[in-house]
C-alpha cells in the first residue's frame, strides 16, 4: 500500500486538489484509494464532500504531526485491514510539518504494509510571495513544506503577474531545486499524481528529497552497550530513530525505543512485535547505517 502525503499551508487548495485526484482516478486510473483527513477542530467539513464511495478516516481536534501523531499508524492500519486500498492519501491540516507526518508514517508497525510513495505540497502563489508579512515561524513552515516535497503544485497561478511568476519560480527553486514543479489554477492537474513516484527504493532504504529513512530488521536481541555506543556517534543529521528491539540482558522483553534531538527513550512493550528499527534524517549515509546495524546484530 502506498501513502501520499498531501501538504500545503492553510487555504492553498488541498481539498480541491484531493477531489480532482479522485475524479481523475475514477475516469482514467481506477485505483483503490482511501483518505485520512486531519482537522484541527472537532468537525471536518471537507470529509462531507468526498462522497461515500471513497473510504476515509478522520483525525480531529489536533494536528497530525503533534497531538494526534500516535494515532496515525492506528488509522492507516485500520484503512488497510478494512479496505485494502492501493493508496492512502493523507490530507494534513495546513499547519502540519511534512517531516513529522513522514515520521508518523514510518512507524515500525506500518513498514510491513505501507510505504510513503510521494510528498506533494500545494502552494498558493500569491500568498507565498507575500509570506514575509507573517511571523517567522509561519514563514519557515511554509518554506519547509516546499523543501521536503517531491512534487510542488503552484496553485492560483492566475492571481499573479508574469514578473511575479518569474520571481516565484526563482524562490521555489532556491528552496527545492529537485522537486517536480507544476503550475496550475483551481488545483487542476493534467497528470496522474498517483503515478508520480517520489521515492527511490533499494531494499529497505527509502529516500525523498532532503529526507530519507532506513528500515532495519533484527533477527534477535542485541547488546545494549553496543547499541548505546552506536547512538552516541550518530550525526546531527539523524532526526529520529524508533522501533522495537530486544537486548541480550533480557532476551524475552521487547522494548519500544524512541530517539529524537539526542534524547533516547526506552519503554517496555507488552506485545511481541517485529524487531524493526527506523532511522530518519537528512542526507543519511544509508549503507553505512545498515552496515553499523549489521555489526550490532552479528557481534
Positions of PLM-derived features:
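C-terminal accessory "lid"/substrate-recognition subdomains
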Residues: 144-272, 284-286, 298-299
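A generic "cationic amphipathic patch" detector
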Residues: 19, 23, 30-31, 85, ...
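Nucleotide-state-sensitive switch-loop elements of NTP-binding domains
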Residues: 2-7, 12-134, 140
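Flexible loop/N-cap segments at domain edges
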Residues: 279
Amino acid at each position: 500500500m502506498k501513502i501520499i502525503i498531501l501538504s500545503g499551508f492553510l487555504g492553498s487548495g488541498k481539498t480541491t486538489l484531493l477531489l480532482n485526484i479522485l475524479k481523475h482516478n475514477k475516469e482514467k486510473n481506477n485505483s483503490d484509494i482511501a483518505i485520512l483527513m486531519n482537522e484541527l477542530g472537532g468537525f471536518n467539513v471537507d470529509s462531507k464532500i468526498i462522497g461515500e464511495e471513497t473510504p476515509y478516516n478522520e483525525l480531529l481536534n489536533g494536528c497530525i504531526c503533534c497531538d494526534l501523531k500516535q494515532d496515525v499508524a492506528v488509522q492507516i492500519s485500520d484503512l488497510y485491514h478494512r479496505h485494502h486500498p492501493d493508496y492512502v492519501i493523507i490530507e494534513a491540516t495546513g499547519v502540519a510539518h511534512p517531516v513529522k507526518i513522514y515520521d508518523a508514517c514510518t512507524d515500525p508497525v506500518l513498514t510491513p504494509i505501507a510505504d510513503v510513495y510521494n510528498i506533494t505540497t500545494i502552494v498558493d502563489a500569491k500568498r507565498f510571495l507575500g509570506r514575509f508579512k507573517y511571523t517567522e515561524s509561519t514563514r519557515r513552515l511554509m518554506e519547509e513544506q516546499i523543501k521536503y516535497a517531491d512534487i510542488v503544485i503552484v496553485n492560483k497561478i492566475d492571481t499573479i503577474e508574469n514578473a511575479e511568476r518569474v520571481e516565484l519560480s526563482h524562490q521555489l527553486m532556491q528552496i527545492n531545486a529537485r522537486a517536480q514543479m507544476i503550475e496550475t489554477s483551481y488545483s487542476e492537474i493534467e497528470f496522474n499524481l498517483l503515478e508520480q513516484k517520489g521515492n527511490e527504493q533499494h531494499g529497505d532504504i527509502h529516500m525523498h528529497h532532503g529526507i530519507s529513512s532506513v528500515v532495519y530488521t533484527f533477527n534477535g536481541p542485541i547488546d545494549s552497550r553496543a547499541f548505546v555506543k552506536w547512538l552516541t556517534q550518530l550525526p546531527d543529521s539523524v532526526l529520529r530513530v524508533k522501533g522495537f528491539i530486544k537486548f541480550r540482558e533480557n532476551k524475552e522483553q521487547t522494548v519500544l525505543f524512541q530517539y529524537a534531538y539526542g534524547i533516547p527513550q526506552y519503554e517496555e512493550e507488552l506485545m511481541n512485535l517485529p524487531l524493526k528499527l527506523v532511522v530518519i534524517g537528512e542526507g543519511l549515509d544509508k549503507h553505512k547505517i545498515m552496515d553499523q546495524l549489521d555489526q550490532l546484530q552479528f557481534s
